[in-house]
A protein has these predicted regions:
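Hydrophobic alpha-helical segments, chiefly the membrane-spanning helices
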Residues: 1-390
Length: 390
């Protein structure tokens, strides 16, 4: 039997990560310590790449059984492909790296926005040089971008004001976010995204038979997936996501730690975003190559809104709960309010706002808008890379 590329990637990644984890558990050190983090990085990426594809195939099978449109099926596939990143963040939070998890989640939004802008350049255009965006993005996705940009701006400015200005009597407000605040903010984001999923599935999710609108049709070639096969795929995907996430979180400790690469925290987060996001970028490119434009577009767009509302929301909830259970913190002073934690949250505002503006003006996107977005994101990336190391 010939293995698919994702299966080969999964097997190789598992063959690298599992022995490393076993040796660490047993306290054995046969491999030089300076080589182990790089093996964890390579194995984690390959394992997560295979896990992402297994999750996507599972969701595509379910979508076929439920007669979902290509775009909405792609949204659920994109959500599934973020599960490995949730494991990465979970292991970072378990290790007490609350700020690293916060920065990693926000840096992912920024990098995925750049990917969406670049991908919008290669979308097939009509005779006027425009690509008509699905109604789900125009009518519902734009609302989500509006809410996300307002939330990021208001919370970011509030954190900055708390950090800069004293209260009456010159006493400073505690310059940390506590467990209760993180849990509250996180639940608010998750609730908004659940409402988004409900609306987009109910009104844009079902295939309309014999329709002339390609956005309400389905061209995905996937077979119905029996429950036992679905269970196997989900188990394989979850196992790979957990092991790969643990491996990448270990590399994150190495990249930002004084005994490792000792990179500034923003540089380490951006490095991890590039490596950890590679599987999702491959999914976008692969779907486009197979002419599954709606699936590729939903993955690219979902990499922005889903990361902010799901991954960032999960990060805050998990940090709040585990910080409360931490005997050293007891729910207090979990996340420091400082430059790095604030700047990326504020940067999420122009990132999502410019996307929202480009989408809502005429429900179309052209090369001028794509180049404009890319230019803005490159300037922001330069600021992060240059000033993030100060």
């Amino acid at each position: 039997m010939k293995l698919h590329s994702w299966q080969i990637s999964y097997v190789i990644g598992l063959a690298i990560v599992a022995p490393l984890l076993l040796l660490e558990t047993l306290g054995l050190h046969f491999i030089p310590e300076n080589i182990v983090p790089y093996l964890e990085l390579i194995g984690g990426i390959m394992l997560i790449a295979g896990s992402c594809e297994a999750f996507v195939l599972s969701v595509e099978g379910l979508a076929h059984n439920m007669h979902l449109t290509d775009y909405v099926a792609g949204i659920y596939a994109s959500i599934a492909s973020t599960i490995p990143e949730l494991f990465v963040l979970f292991f970072l939070i378990i290790g007490g790296q609350y700020e690293m998890a916060w920065i990693l989640a926000l840096a992912t939004i920024f990098m995925n926005s750049l990917v969406f802008a670049v991908y919008s350049l290669v979308l097939p255009k009509d005779h006027e040089g425009n690509y008509r965006l699905p109604d789900a993005i125009h009518h519902v996705g734009s609302d989500l971008l509006t809410m996300g940009s307002v939330i990021s701006l208001s919370v970011g400015l509030s954190m900055m004001l708390v950090h800069l200005f004293p209260t009456h009597g010159t006493a400073l407000i505690p310059q940390y976010l506590d467990s209760s605040e993180l849990i509250l903010f996180g639940f608010c984001l998750i609730i908004v995204f659940v409402a988004y999923l409900y609306r987009i599935t109910k009104y844009y999710g079902k295939v309309v038979p014999n329709t002339d609108d390609p956005l309400l049709d389905s061209d995905l070639v996937s077979m119905p997936m029996p429950k036992n096969v679905l269970g196997i795929f989900l188990f394989i995907a979850a196992l790979g996501a957990a092991l790969g996430g643990e491996a990448l979180s270990s590399f994150a400790h190495f990249a930002s730690g004084p005994e490792g690469l000792n990179l500034p925290i923003i540089h380490a987060a951006l490095l991890l975003v590039v490596f950890g996001g590679t599987p999702e970028y491959i999914i976008v490119a692969s779907s486009h190559r197979k002419d599954e434009i709606e699936v590729a577009l939903s993955n690219a767009f979902g990499g922005i809104v889903q990361v902010f509302f799901v991954i960032f929301g999960f990060t805050m909830i998990a940090s709040g709960i585990l910080g409360y259970l931490d005997p050293n913190l007891l729910g207090h002073e979990i996340l420091p309010i400082e430059l790095y934690s604030v700047v990326l949250l504020l940067f999420a505002f122009p990132t999502m706002f410019i996307l929202r503006t480009m989408i809502t003006d005429d429900a179309k996107i052209n090369a001028l808008e794509s180049v404009s977005m890319i230019s803005v994101f490159i300037m922001m990336l330069y600021i992060l890379l240059f000033y993030g190391g100060i």
